[in-house]
Curated annotation (Swiss-Prot):
Assembly, per entry: Binds directly to helix 1 of the histone fold of histone H4, a region that is not accessible when H4 is in chromatin. Subunit of the type B histone acetyltransferase (HAT) complex, composed of RBBP7 and HAT1. Subunit of the core histone deacetylase (HDAC) complex, which is composed of HDAC1, HDAC2, RBBP4 and RBBP7. The core HDAC complex associates with SIN3A, ARID4B/SAP180, SAP18, SAP30, SAP130, SUDS3/SAP45 and possibly ARID4A/RBP1 and ING1 to form the SIN3 HDAC complex.
Residues with the Phosphoserine modification: 3, 95, 354
Pfam families documented for this protein: CAF1C_H4-bd, WD40
Compartments reported by the entry: Nucleus
Residue(s) carrying Phosphothreonine: 10
Crosslink site: Glycyl lysine isopeptide (Lys-Gly) (interchain with G-Cter in SUMO2): 4, 101, 155, 159
Assigned keywords, A-Z: Acetylation, Chaperone, Chromatin regulator, DNA replication, Isopeptide bond, Nucleus, Phosphoprotein, Repeat, Repressor, Transcription, Transcription regulation, Ubl conjugation, WD repeat
Protein name: Histone-binding protein RBBP7
Length: 425
C-alpha cells in the first residue's frame, strides 16, 4: 500500500513540475508583473499595509507587507517587509524575463527588492495577522494558543530580542483554543473579532484598555456554531453587523446590538461541506461571498439568504481564502489547496462561450494564477495598485503578480498568441 502511495506522490510531483514549467514559459503573455521570492520560513498569512511611498527619481514605489513565520521549532516572528514595485512607466519588456526564475517586470532577479524591515518575536507560528484600519501600526495576530496578541510595531525594535521573549502590547483573552479568523471593524476603531476551534467568536474593544497587566477580556462571546469556526468578518458598511462561517456548514449573520449572543440574526446552510472563509463586498451593502471545502465559492445577498445567488466552480480542492477586489465591485478571488488562485468577474456570469472556452472554465473565471506548486496559505489585494496580488504558499514561496491588462480590459482584443501553451489548471 505504501509503495502505491509513494508512486502516486511521485506522479503528482511530476505533474506539478510540468505544469509549473508551462506556467513559467507563458508568464510574459499572461502577466504585467511577476515577482517570486523564497521566504526563510513559510508564511501562513499575508496582508498589504495601506502605506505607499514613491521615492523621487526612481522607477519604483515602496510598499509594505505584514507576514508571519511558521518555523520548525525555531523562534517565530511577526514580520513587516518592504517591497519595491516598478512604476507603470518603468522601462522593461517581456524579453527581459528571467526564464530561470520565471520573473519579469523590470526585475531580472528580486534580490534586494523584498526585504524584512521589522521582525518581532512571536509565540509559536503566526496563524493570521491583520492590521487595524484606523491605525495600521497596530497588528493583531492569531497564535497556536487561545490568546490573540496585539502589537504596535512602532514600539518594538526592528531587530528582535535574541532571548526570544514575546512581548505583545496587549493579550486578548476569551477563547479556549486556537483559530484563524480575525477581523477589525473598519467603522469602529479598536473593535476586533476572532474565530476559534472552540466553536465561538470573540469580540474585544481594545480601547477599553487592559484590566491588569496587558490582558483584555472579551466584550462578548458568540456561541451559535456547533463546530470549529473557520472565519469571521465585519460588514464593511454597517458597524454592528458581522458574519461567521464554520465546519457546521453554516453561514451566520450577527448584529452586536442584539441582546443575545447565542443566536444569530440569520442562519443559512451555505455549503455541503465545511465553510472556510467569507468576504463582504466593499462596494455593496448586501453582497458577500463564502468559500468551502466543497470546492465552490458561493455568492449571497443579505436581503434573501434563502437563495444562493451563484456558485463559482473551477477549484479542484478545498477553498480557504476568498477576497473581493478593493478596486472593482464585480471582481473577487479565491484560493486554497489546489495551488491555484482564481480571479472571478461577476459581470461575466451567463455570457455565451465557445465550446473550446467552456473547457477552460465558466465565463466568469477571468484568470487562473498557476505560479504556486504548493497549497496557497493566504493572499492579499494591493490597495494602492489595482490588480496586484501577493500570495504565499506552504513551500516558503511568496509571489507578487499582476495579470496582463488585456485580460481584464475588454476594450482590447483577446490574446491570440500562438506561442501560448496549454494553461490547463
Amino acid at each position: 500500500m505504501a509503495s502505491k502511495e509513494m508512486f502516486e506522490d511521485t506522479v503528482e510531483e511530476r505533474v506539478i513540475n510540468e505544469e509549473y514549467k508551462i506556467w513559467k514559459k507563458n508568464t510574459p503573455f499572461l502577466y504585467d508583473l511577476v515577482m517570486t521570492h523564497a521566504l526563510q520560513w513559510p508564511s501562513l498569512t499575508v496582508q498589504w499595509l495601506p502605506e505607499v511611498t514613491k521615492p523621487e527619481g526612481k522607477d519604483y514605489a515602496l510598499h509594505w507587507l505584514v507576514l508571519g513565520t511558521h518555523t520548525s521549532d525555531e523562534q517565530n516572528h511577526l514580520v513587516v517587509a518592504r517591497v519595491h514595485i516598478p512604476n507603470d512607466d518603468a522601462q522593461f519588456d517581456a524579453s527581459h524575463c528571467d526564464s530561470e526564475k520565471g520573473e519579469f517586470g523590470g526585475f531580472g532577479s528580486v534580490t534586494g527588492k523584498i526585504e524584512c524591515e521589522i521582525k518581532i518575536n512571536h509565540e509559536g507560528e503566526v496563524n493570521r495577522a491583520r492590521y487595524m484600519p484606523q491605525n495600521p501600526h497596530i497588528i493583531a495576530t492569531k497564535t497556536p494558543s487561545s490568546d490573540v496578541l496585539v502589537f504596535d510595531y512602532t514600539k518594538h525594535p526592528a531587530k528582535p530580542d535574541p532571548s526570544g521573549e514575546c512581548n505583545p502590547d496587549l493579550r486578548l483573552r476569551g477563547h479556549q483554543k486556537e483559530g484563524y479568523g480575525l477581523s477589525w471593524n473598519s467603522n469602529l476603531s479598536g473593535h476586533l473579532l476572532s474565530a476559534s476551534d472552540d466553536h465561538t467568536v470573540c469580540l474585544w474593544d481594545i480601547n477599553a484598555g487592559p484590566k491588569e497587566g496587558k490582558i483584555v477580556d472579551a466584550k462578548a462571546i458568540f456561541t451559535g456554531h456547533s463546530a470549529v469556526v473557520e472565519d469571521v468578518a465585519w460588514h464593511l458598511l454597517h458597524e454592528s453587523l458581522f458574519g461567521s462561517v464554520a465546519d457546521d456548514q453554516k453561514l451566520m449573520i450577527w448584529d452586536t446590538r442584539s441582546n443575545t449572543t447565542s443566536k444569530p440574526s440569520h442562519l443559512v446552510d451555505a455549503h455541503t461541506a465545511e465553510v472556510n472563509c467569507l468576504s463582504f463586498n466593499p462596494y455593496s451593502e448586501f453582497i458577500l461571498a463564502t468559500g468551502s471545502a466543497d470546492k465552490t465559492v458561493a455568492l449571497w445577498d443579505l436581503r434573501n439568504l434563502k437563495l444562493k445567488l451563484h456558485t463559482f466552480e473551477s477549484h479542484k480542492d478545498e477553498i480557504f481564502q476568498v477576497h473581493w477586489s478593493p478596486h472593482n465591485e464585480t471582481i473577487l478571488a479565491s484560493s486554497g489547496t489546489d495551488r491555484r488562485l482564481n480571479v472571478w468577474d461577476l459581470s461575466k456570469i451567463g455570457e455565451e462561450q465557445s465550446a473550446e472556452d467552456a473547457e477552460d472554465g465558466p465565463p466568469e473565471l477571468l484568470f487562473i494564477h498557476g505560479g504556486h506548486t504548493a497549497k496557497i496559505s493566504d493572499f492579499s489585494w494591493n490597495p494602492n495598485e489595482p490588480w496586484v496580488i501577493c500570495s504565499v504558499s506552504e513551500d516558503n514561496i511568496m509571489q507578487i503578480w499582476q495579470m496582463a491588462e488585456n485580460i481584464y480590459n475588454d476594450e482590447e482584443s483577446d490574446v491570440t498568441t500562438p506561442e501560448l501553451e496549454g494553461q490547463g489548471s
